[in-house]
């Protein structure tokens, strides 16, 4: 089981936003700042377990679960396709009428339609493939603020170790901002 990003999002923090936050007026470090923008988004996604910005993902499973399919990186906005390899080794597409997307819960789930069972699959790895779109087109301001704080940290601290200084985490820093949208383990 695993998932991967098929189409990454447009970064919610633009290069102009980051430069303004960093108080940088020249373009000499644009490539580096661009790397930090992506790194900040990915760190926010990892911490919150949510997709930041609209993106297409693919989840692969070795078989259908007994219950619902838990889709990583909510909020899921659409299922593009749900395909599987049947017991004869033939790829099939499950009709949308055979399942429902639950977007109301804290995480997103694909649930079998009432009175149905998941189909049988070939006994092999990655035989169930769910392609879906996740993430809000416009992330909350708290996420953008957390990204800007992270970008600022990376800009000011270009090494993994700082000698001769005391580090203090801001009480209303990145984690406090991201906790407002984080998926907490149940």
Name every feature range the model reports, one short phrase each:
Residues 1-186:
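Divalent metal-cofactor coordination and adjacent catalytic microenvironments
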């Amino acid at each position: 089981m695993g998932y991967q990003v098929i189409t990454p999002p447009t970064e919610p923090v633009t290069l102009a936003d980051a430069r303004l936050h960093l108080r940088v007026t020249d373009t000499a470090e644009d490539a580096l700042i661009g790397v930090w923008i992506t790194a900040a988004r990915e760190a926010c996604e990892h911490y919150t377990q949510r997709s930041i910005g609209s993106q297409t993902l693919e989840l692969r499973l070795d078989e259908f679960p007994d219950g619902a399919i838990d889709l990583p990186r909510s909020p899921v906005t659409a299922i593009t396709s749900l395909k599987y390899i049947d017991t004869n080794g033939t790829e099939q597409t499950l009709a949308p009428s055979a399942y429902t997307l639950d977007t109301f819960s804290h995480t997103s789930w694909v649930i079998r339609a009432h009175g149905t069972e998941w189909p049988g699959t070939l006994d092999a790895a990655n035989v169930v493939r769910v392609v879906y779109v996740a993430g809000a087109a416009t992330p909350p301001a708290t996420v953008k603020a957390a990204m800007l704080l992270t970008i600022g940290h990376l800009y000011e601290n270009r090494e993994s170790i700082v000698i001769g200084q005391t580090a203090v985490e801001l009480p209303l820093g990145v984690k406090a901002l991201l906790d407002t949208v984080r998926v907490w383990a149940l």
